Regions:
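Extracellular beta-sheet/turn segments enriched in Thr/Pro/Gly and aliphatic residues
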Residues: 42, 152-196, 203-207, 310-347
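Ser/Thr/Pro-rich, low-complexity mucin-like regions
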Residues: 195-196, 205-212, 281-311, 326-333, ...
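Solvent-exposed N-terminal domain segments of exported/luminal and surface proteins
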Residues: 24-148, 513, 520-585, 590-603
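Bacterial Sec-dependent N-terminal signal peptides
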Residues: 16-45, 202, 321, 326, ...
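C-terminal, surface-exposed recognition/capping segments
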Residues: 501, 597-800
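Bacterial N-terminal signal peptides
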Residues: 8-16
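Tryptophan-paired
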Residues: 64-147, 201-320
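Short, compositionally biased
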Residues: 290, 333, 338, 345-651, ...
């Protein structure tokens, strides 16, 4: 036979995996002694169904689709069959079932020559009225269906198919006749064949005049692996039963694929046919590339075109013997068209989400997107820490209608971090990088004017998420009075810089030092706050240049409110109210109210809670919730000593770290001192730092400005007690800058040039209202210290 190259479907009979029962396997092609009669078989060919074509109403800047219309058929090329080739029959399997008992009476295999649609075969005689099935172009399957097999089992006959370019394979077909009279001599039989596959054709045209679109990939996604020869599967395939086909990226492509009964949705607008709004297993064409509008910048873009009936927006079924033709004219990157995906996806279609997304400013692509219907990492959230007041199921979705910029830094006071923030109809926030080489921003998804959730964009020329630099940390547990001794852990991978910083390099040059500060976080909150913008010994320091969504400069000590203005409640409802307020107001810095120390609010009349959550006193409801916001917790909430905290931090929806990272546990810095019986020390002999950093300046007004400090902070050995380089080339010297913090009492940025700090995810102990953190000043190193949860400190994330 003539060799034909088929793109998409390749059925190799000898290698197929059939879904047959053990009874079907039987003795194989051994037929009992039955009388047969010659039969003249004539085969007819049922034309492929057309899905119908309707021209869609559309704007000037959208994806132009006419589904099901096949005007101006594309010329034949390698990988596409001609009409004659689609009708070709090379071999047949004939199966005869008795209508009385629906069991197999006889089977036969025959080959046909080119163009032949008739054959002289034999069928069992004396069996009364029978149903005869003809399978074409599937090889010899007679041994797969044993004598006595039921018709119901036969209809389940299926094979696995693979993508690729086959050699000499015709399309599998099936036909039947249910009233063959086996008592008639010299009978004739006519059977109409239908193809057991669907045909998908893509005709892609170029953009508007002046625009440019470069194709990087054309794929057919969610293709069923299993081909049922006889009749359709009863249900849609599972995700494990799906595969994808690729192409050579030419503008005219054809695939032949098994049917996929994906189902229907109640949709009336073609622009609503997008992921999350359609059946999860629906088959679609994915066109990926780079689009450059006239006078604009290049952007990564993808177009998702779901198959189905051409006149029904809600239909997603791919039926056998049906032709699906997609005439796609790429005409822009309209965010109001759900089929259009603009920008490089940072969230892997919603499967790799977090509250922080890292983008590399030196990449050619400046457009990005992430799934904005998922809160943080989408983790299941207990009612105890839920801002909704009820448990949030894993993967629960929000429904934004728009997006906006909350704040951004501007490099040098002018260069913007983000030039554009928008919301796409398909549930993505889309943003474009500005001209800044380094910066931080917060963007929000909203319903109307209400913020539903917000995310931190960390823009840096150093790396993207995949390239984040880490260092190995070993812990150094020891017996210390009043502390629990945890087990030692080694090789913990920790970022080599603060979250949001442009550099982790030790320096004492102002321009370089400020790059190391990163951003500040209040304990348990996901949204960052701008850090100090000076290298000086300063309290009430100026912050880096930062602007809100309206373009107004944000001043230091602004956008702050006392927690007692939200509520003075002490129950779970009060916790919910405060969490909800911070979610809806990511720019608002929450000040503590020390008046919560009184007994009426659960206090002891002496000690405030020092928390941005009102009245979070030890063992009280707000305190128990605060303990778990970042996934840290006490081993025993009633009795735990310092360091008796969970070391396996379970990332929550409030965790501020990028995907693949989480907040550190309390013991992460224990190698920073080497004293035998204490963790915290002001003795330089106990400091596990480079030699040049073994110095104390006890005057807090001088701090690290002292010339004896060669860098603006200290450099610690994360493993061992001497400088070393790991096999991967990373150093064991970690620099922690004197970046200061933002005070939870008045919102001022203090201790710049004096304090080197970093939050852990852990509460300090069962008796303390504080949380654990690294505390270093110019005259001490305290790796196991505690502080007020209303304060905002830098964060250094740990790799999962």
């Amino acid at each position: 036979m003539k060799v034909t190259r088929i793109l998409g479907l390749w059925i190799v009979s000898a290698l197929c995996f059939f879904s047959c029962t053990e009874e079907e396997q039987g003795p194989g092609n051994i037929i009992p002694d039955v009388s047969t009669t010659p039969v003249r078989l004539a085969l007819g060919m049922t034309p492929m169904h057309e899905t119908g074509g309707v021209t869609r109403a559309r704007g000037d800047n959208s994806l132009d689709l006419v589904l099901g219309e096949e005007s101006d058929r594309a010329g034949t090329r390698a990988g596409t069959l001609t009409d004659d080739q689609e009708n070709a029959v090379g071999d047949i399997c004939v199966f005869q079932f008795g209508n009385g008992d629906s069991k197999l009476k006889y089977s036969e295999y025959a080959t046909l020559t080119d163009g032949q649609l008739t054959a002289d075969i034999s069928l069992a005689s004396g069996m009364g009225t029978c149903t005869v099935y003809v399978l074409a172009n599937v090889g010899d399957l007679t041994s797969r269906v044993a004598y006595g097999s039921t018709l119901a089992d036969f209809k389940k006959l299926a094979a696995e198919v693979t993508s690729g370019k086959g050699t000499g394979q015709n399309l599998p077909m099936c036909g039947s006749k249910n009233d063959f009279n086996s008592e008639t001599a010299n009978a004739s039989l006519t059977v109409q064949l239908t193809r057991s596959v669907a045909k998908v054709s893509l005709n892609l045209t170029t953009p508007n005049t002046g625009d440019a679109f470069t194709v990087s990939a054309i794929k057919l996604m969610n293709v069923a692996k299993k081909l049922y020869y006889v009749e359709s599967a009863a249900t849609a395939p599972t995700p494990a039963e799906l595969t994808s086909y690729t192409s050579d990226n030419t503008k005219t492509v054809a695939w032949y694929i098994p049917e996929n009964k994906a189902g229907s949705k109640s949709l009336t607008d073609w622009k609503d046919r997008y992921e999350g709004n359609v059946p999860a297993t629906a088959t679609y064409v994915l066109i990926e590339g780079s689009y450059t509008p006239k006078g604009g910048t290049a952007r990564d873009v993808a177009y998702s075109i779901y198959l189905g009936a051409g006149d029904k927006p809600g239909d997603f079924n791919v039926a056998r013997n049906t032709r699906y033709t997609v005439n796609a004219s790429i005409k822009g990157t309209n965010l109001n068209d759900g089929r259009v995906l603009v920008g490089k996806d940072l969230s892997a279609a919603g499967t790799e989400t977090a509250n922080c997304y890292v983008v590399k400013t030196t990449d050619a692509n400046k457009w990005y997107r992430f799934k904005a219907t998922v809160r943080g990492n989408g983790a299941q959230t207990a009612a105890q820490i839920s801002y909704t007041g009820a448990e949030i199921p894993a993967g629960d979705k929000i429904a934004p209608t728009n997006a906006s910029l909350v704040w951004e830094t501007r490099e040098g006071g002018t260069a913007r971090t983000l030039d554009y923030v928008g919301y796409s109809r398909n549930g993505y926030i889309v943003f474009k990088l500005g001209s800044a080489t380094e910066g931080n921003a917060v963007v929000a998804a909203k319903s109307g004017t209400t913020t539903l959730w917000s995310w931190h964009i960390w823009a840096t020329k150093a790396f993207d998420r995949a390239g984040i630099k880490v260092q190995a940390y070993d812990t150094r547990p020891r017996v210390v009075d009043g502390h629990f001794k945890p087990a030692q852990r080694k090789g913990i991978k920790v970022m080599d810089r603060h979250l949001g910083s442009a550099s982790g390099a030790a320096s004492k040059v102002a321009a370089e030092v400020i790059k190391t500060y990163g951003v500040y976080f209040q304990f348990g909150r996901k949204d960052p706050f701008p850090a100090a913008g000076v290298m000086a010994r300063a309290d009430d320091a100026e912050i880096v240049p930062v602007y809100d969504g309206s373009g107004s400069k944000i001043l230091k000590n602004s956008n702050q409110k006392k927690n007692s203005e939200i509520t003075k409640g002490t129950d779970q409802a009060a916790v919910k109210a405060q969490l909800a307020y911070t979610v809806e107001n990511p720019l608002m810095f929450m000040l503590r109210d020390d008046g919560d120390k009184v007994a009426a609010y659960g206090g002891d009349d002496t000690n405030p809670s020092y928390n941005w959550i009102f009245a979070a006193h030890p063992q009280k409801t707000p305190w128990k919730a605060s303990n778990k916001l970042w996934g840290g917790s006490l081993v025993d909430e009633a009795t735990s000593l310092p360091l008796a905290t969970e070391v396996n931090i379970k990332k929550t929806i409030y965790d501020p770290c990028p995907y693949g990272y989480h907040m550190p546990p309390q013991d992460i810095w224990t190698n920073f001192t080497v004293a035998a019986t204490v963790y915290n020390s002001s003795n330089i002999a106990d400091y596990n730092v480079v030699a040049g950093d073994k110095f104390n300046q006890t005057d807090s007004k001088i701090g690290f400005t002292d010339a004896n400090f060669k860098v603006w902070g200290r450099r610690y050995f994360t493993t061992g007690e001497a400088s070393a380089t790991a096999a991967d080339g990373t150093s064991n010297e970690a620099f922690y800058p004197a970046a200061g913090y933002r005070n939870g009492a008045d919102g001022r940025v203090n201790h710049v040039g004096w304090g080197c700090y970093a939050w852990s995810a852990s509460p300090f102990s069962a008796a303390s209202q504080s949380a654990g953190f690294l505390s270093v000043r110019s005259y001490w190193v305290y790796p196991v210290n505690y502080t007020h949860r209303a304060d905002a400190f830098p964060v250094r994330c740990v790799r999962d």
